[in-house]
């Protein structure tokens, strides 16, 4: 019950911003098998304050759907939350499929309590895993600034 209330509260936070349509988009979700979405919701709320437009897919999203959403929305990046179970045998397949199908120019961020469990895999795939939310926000700020500079 407390989780449902917290989810509603965090979900409402991310819709308080007024969007202009010029914000860069970020797809936020949890991969197949990952049902705990509070971390993903927190990221959605935080990045909206930082000028990103979160495209929130909810939990348990297959790699193919993440790729399709990123391509259709024109997302500049993808953020995944990995929490429980840390040793989910589907994670390596889903992350590998996501990285292979998504444009290599689109960075993929991975965070959450189970991200460290998959460090070797995420490193090999070139996924980014900032250890804190502040570092994620900083990385997204740098990404946004580099893309603004590239389009000028």
Sequence positions of predicted segments:
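C-terminal regulatory/effector modules of DNA-binding transcriptional regulators
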Residues: 1-2, 8-152
């Amino acid at each position: 019950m407390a989780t449902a209330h917290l989810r509603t509260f965090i979900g409402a936070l991310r819709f308080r911003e007024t969007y202009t349509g010029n914000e860069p988009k970020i797809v936020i979700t949890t991969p197949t098998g990952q049902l705990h979405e509070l971390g993903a919701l927190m990221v959605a709320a935080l990045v909206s304050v930082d000028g990103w437009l979160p495209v929130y897919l909810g939990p348990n999203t297959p790699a193919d759907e993440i790729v399709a959403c990123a391509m259709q929305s024109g997302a500049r990046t993808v953020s995944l939350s990995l929490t429980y179970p840390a040793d989910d045998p589907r994670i390596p397949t889903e992350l590998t499929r996501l990285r292979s199908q998504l444009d290599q120019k689109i960075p993929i961020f991975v965070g959450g309590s189970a991200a460290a469990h998959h460090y070797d895999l995420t490193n090999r795939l070139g996924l980014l895993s900032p250890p804190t939310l502040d570092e994620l926000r900083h990385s997204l700020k740098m990404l946004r600034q580099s893309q603004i500079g590239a389009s000028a």
